Swiss-Prot record:
Ranges of Basic and acidic residues composition bias in the record: 71-97
Protein family (similarity comment): Belongs to the krueppel C2H2-type zinc-finger protein family.
Region entry Mediates interaction with CBFA2T3, spans: 497-608
Modified-residue entries (Phosphoserine), positions: S57, S100, S196, S203
Main location (coarse class): nucleus
Compositional bias (Low complexity): 194-208
Keyword tags: DNA-binding, Metal-binding, Nucleus, Phosphoprotein, Repeat, Repressor, Transcription, Transcription regulation, Zinc, Zinc-finger
Molecular function per GO: DNA binding; zinc ion binding
UniProt name for this protein: Zinc finger protein 652
Naturally occurring in which organism (per UniProt): Mus musculus
Function description: Functions as a transcriptional repressor.
InterPro entries according to UniProt: Znf_C2H2_sf, Znf_C2H2_type
Source lineage: Eukaryota, Metazoa, Chordata, Craniata, Vertebrata
């Protein structure tokens, strides 16, 4: 001990100084919130009760000069002297202040609920205080922090020091009252904490909510145990189910019902090919597959067109030979098609690009297939062959129309006129003649037609195109029927003259002699045979045909119409054989012509 007992007046000044410093430090450490401030003068006068002295005689006090230091350890013990009555007065003040701090008590209760779990009955009595997951009370883990008697004595000495300092001024007295109120509140908090900790240690372990949850979870563990007990039984059943395997395939089933269903659908109803192992639902599909020998392409019965897949054959029969409707239309020209793929191919026709050009004639096409078809005109190739008669055709549609000869009938027949057709395209064009529909209109003159080929044929009258040339003379024509008529005239031979049976026309060879000029003499046309001798030398000088301006009438009633002018628009017919020209006449030919001239000159004299 650094200080000994001394008279009280000698220690008043240092104690007052230290008490004020301590009060300032304590005000910084713990300041009460403004809502819990109460005036000390209104409730009671602490100066008359806490430090009441009956006699004016001085008493001995041990003061610590280190109290003004900020932090004191709780383990330090401070010796002090006090009056026994002063301690009882302090406790009475504490009991009186308990009723005025209800709001502070509510704050402490909420603070405790956040930290620990407290069970309270209806009378606000604490039943249990626990903390942690296993229901162990928090006091068992952490020992309650109780104030020792030395710490309480230290606080009382501080209060006494502040009481002595209040004698020197009213400001010090006011500060003293505020500090005393704060001290009382701190002690109340500590006592409540100590009481709750003691109750937790002494009370028996009650049944908490967590304990109830644990007891409720026990049956679940039993259920898990039962499940674990059933697990080997289920595994044994699964092993039994896995034994249900299909005899024809490696599939495995859990139940017999699934196995029977699999057998009925897959193996009993499905038709399997013996050669390649392919499966078919219908027997007809299997028979059709076997007809192709599992390798050949599937062929159409009507047109013998081959396909690699069955659905392609169905589409072909539906579109070409059957009942399909053109449901897909072009957005630009409104032309209808059977499938959308045909519409896409048709859309190329509306583009201006023509990248495929013929090397022979220079004509351009939009599709490669159109160029291939066009090239057949130059090459003369006939790639399409009939398997029944080995006849070959240049285009596929020609082969299709030819197949009606072997089938014995044509598939499409008109109900109005009875005309039949090989292809549905021609049948549709023919039906428009009965309905009067003419959807194809000429862009130049506005004339309408039943079919597109007819419209293209009509358009040649405006463009002047002549795509049909004659192989003999090279003349070109606008239509194919005009070329056909021209060929008949080109290869036509005039009919022979009716010669009397007594007259013999010698065909033997004779030395060529210059014949007299026969002009303006009506003669009959010569027979269509070669008059020149064999081995005769052909003249190098071409002479015009002598019969180009003659027309002989053998009938007696028309003898007065002898001189008839030649037809101007018809060219002279060419020679049929590679022989000498007809103006190279022999001697027998000259005598025959002279004889005919004399006979014709005598006939008009008899008529008149």
């Amino acid at each position: 001990m650094s200080y000994t007992a001394s008279p009280c007046p000698e220690l008043v000044e240092p104690c007052a100084v230290h008490a004020e410093g301590m009060a300032q430090e304590e005000s910084h450490r713990s300041q009460a919130p403004p809502t819990f401030y109460h005036g000390a003068s209104q409730e009671l006068d602490l100066s008359t009760k806490v430090y009441k002295r009956e006699s004016g005689s001085p008493y001995s006090v041990l003061a610590d000069t280190k109290m003004s230091k900020p932090h004191l350890h709780e383990t330090e013990e401070q010796p002090y002297f006090r009056e026994p009555r002063a301690v009882s007065d302090v406790h009475t003040v504490k009991e009186d202040r308990e009723n005025s701090d209800d709001t502070e008590e509510e704050e402490e209760v909420s603070y405790k609920r956040e930290q620990i779990i407290v069970e309270v009955n209806l009378n606000n009595q604490t039943l249990n205080v626990s903390k942690g997951e296993k229901g162990v009370s928090s006091q068992s883990k952490e020992t309650p922090v109780l104030k020792t008697s030395s710490e309480e004595d230290e606080e009382e000495t501080e209060e006494e020091a502040t009481d002595n300092s209040s004698d020197y001024g009213e400001n010090g007295r006011q500060k003293k009252k505020e500090k005393q109120v704060e001290r009382v509140r701190v002690t109340q908090r500590r006592t409540r904490r100590a009481a709750s900790a003691a109750a937790a240690t002494t009370s028996p372990a009650p049944r908490t909510t967590r304990g109830r949850r644990k007891s409720a979870e026990l049956p679940k563990r039993k259920k898990r145990a039962t499940k674990e007990a059933k697990a080997p039984v289920q595994k044994a059943k699964c092993e039994e189910k896995e034994t249900l395997t299909c005899e024809k395939c490696p599939r495995v089933f859990n139940t017999r019902w699934y196995l029977e269903k699999h057998m009925n659908v897959t193996h009993r109803r499905m038709q399997i090919c013996d050669k390649c192992g392919k499966k078919f639902v219908l027997e007809s599909e299997l028979s059709l597959h076997q007809q192709t020998d599992c390798e050949k392409n599937i062929q159409c019965v009507s047109c013998n067109k081959s396909f690699k897949k069955l659905w392609s054959l169905h589409e072909h029969i539906k579109i070409v030979h059957g009942y399909a409707e053109k449901k897909f239309a072009c957005e630009i020209c409104e032309k209808k098609f059977y499938t959308m793929a045909h519409v896409r191919k048709h859309m190329v026709a509306h583009t201006k690009d023509m990248p495929f050009t013929c090397e022979t004639c220079g004509k351009s096409f939009k599709r490669s297939m159109s160029l291939k078809v066009h090239s057949l005109q130059h090459s003369g190739e006939k790639p399409f062959r009939c398997e029944n008669c080995d006849e070959r055709f240049q285009y596929k549609y020609q082969l299709r129309s030819h197949m009606s000869i072997h089938i014995g009938h044509k598939q499409f027949m008109c109900q109005w006129c009875g005309k039949d057709f090989n292809m549905k395209q021609y049948f549709d064009e023919h039906m428009k003649t009965h309905t009067g529909e003419k959807p194809f209109i000429c862009e130049i003159c506005g004339k309408s037609f039943t079919s597109r080929p007819n419209m293209k044929r009509h358009r040649r009258t405006h463009t002047g195109e002549k795509p049909y040339p004659c192989d003999v003379c090279g003349q070109r024509f606008r239509f194919s029927n005009m070329l056909k008529a021209h060929k008949e005239k080109c290869f036509r031979v005039t009919s022979p003259v009716n010669v009397p049976p007594a007259v013999q026309i010698p065909l033997a060879s004779a030395p060529a002699a210059p014949a007299p000029a026969v002009a303006n003499t009506p003669t009959s046309p010569a027979p269509a045979v070669s008059m020149s001798p064999v081995g005769a030398v052909l003249p190098s000088r071409p002479v015009p045909h002598p019969f180009s301006h003659l027309h002989i009438h053998t009938h007696p009633h028309h003898a007065h119409h002898l001189p008839i002018p030649p037809v101007p628009h018809l060219p002279p017919p060419p020679a049929l054989f590679k022989s000498e020209p007809l103006n190279h006449r022999s001697q027998s030919e000259d005598t025959f012509l002279r004889h005919l001239a004399e006979k014709n000159s005598a006939a008009p004299a008899q008529h008149h």
